[in-house]
């Protein structure tokens, strides 16, 4: 069996409310998330959505991480469109090489049995 080391997340954000006494400007939440600014805008990589029980819901890859992740919460064709409210935590790993992104995505989907991925699934 091939052993692939999954990279450690570069960024992890969770649902949170903005405190009234925060010195940061008021941020409009997107499905409970207000920290999208922490996700790199022009970097490629993989991302994982988890629920509050740390169950892997979805794995994806992107050339531009922030844009793609936000799109999952906005568009009507996302595989998680009916499950957006389940997402509690987002982990992001910056991976520059497109081939490596593809390998990591497929590997994570199949070894960690993501709940809502429908493509690249070999474990069902």
Curated annotation (Swiss-Prot):
PROSITE patterns: GIY_YIG (PS50164). Residues 42-118 form the GIY-YIG domain. One of its GO terms (biological process) is nucleotide-excision repair. It comes from the Bacteria. Gene3D superfamilies: GIY-YIG endonuclease (3.40.1440.10). Pfam families: GIY-YIG (PF01541). This is Uncharacterized protein YurQ. It comes from Bacillus subtilis (strain 168). The gene is yurQ.
